[in-house]
């Protein structure tokens, strides 16, 4: 049976993550408050950030930046802004 959560990002009930994907207290919060759909959206944004800003997940400063951006995106409603990126037209 799938686990459902009230997703803070989507502001509705949605399928929850299968397990805690991120360590610590923030990871617990993500597991309890973020849906699979919202997590997929974050992963897409994170990939863009890593590629466009040439970040390394091995660099502690880059990991800190990614964590800050993740928190702003998932819990504070801030979209990721990447200089020079224009989203495709629908």
UniProtKB/Swiss-Prot annotation:
Main function: Could be a mediator in iron transactions between iron acquisition and iron-requiring processes, such as synthesis and/or repair of Fe-S clusters in biosynthetic enzymes.
Keyword list, A-Z: Iron
UniProt keyword Iron present: yes
SUPFAM superfamilies: YggX-like
Transmembrane segments: none
Family: Belongs to the Fe(2+)-trafficking protein family.
One biological process term in Gene Ontology: cellular response to oxidative stress
GO cellular component, one term: cytosol
InterPro entries per UniProt: Fe_traffick_prot_YggX (IPR007457), Fe_traffick_prot_YggX_sf (IPR036766)
PANTHER family (alphabetical): FE(2+)-TRAFFICKING PROTEIN-RELATED
Entry annotated with the keyword Iron: yes
Assembly mode: Monomer.
Listed GO MF terms: iron ion binding
Protein name: Probable Fe(2+)-trafficking protein
């Amino acid at each position: 049976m799938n686990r459902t959560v009230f997703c803070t990002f989507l502001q509705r009930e949605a399928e929850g993550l299968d397990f805690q994907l991120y360590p610590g207290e923030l990871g617990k919060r993500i597991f309890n408050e973020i849906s699979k759909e919202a997590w997929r959206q974050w992963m897409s944004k994170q990939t863009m950030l890593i590629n466009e800003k040439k970040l390394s997940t091995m660099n502690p400063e880059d990991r800190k930046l990614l964590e800050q951006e993740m928190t702003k995106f998932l819990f504070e409603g801030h979209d990721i802004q990447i200089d020079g990126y224009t989203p495709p037209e629908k």
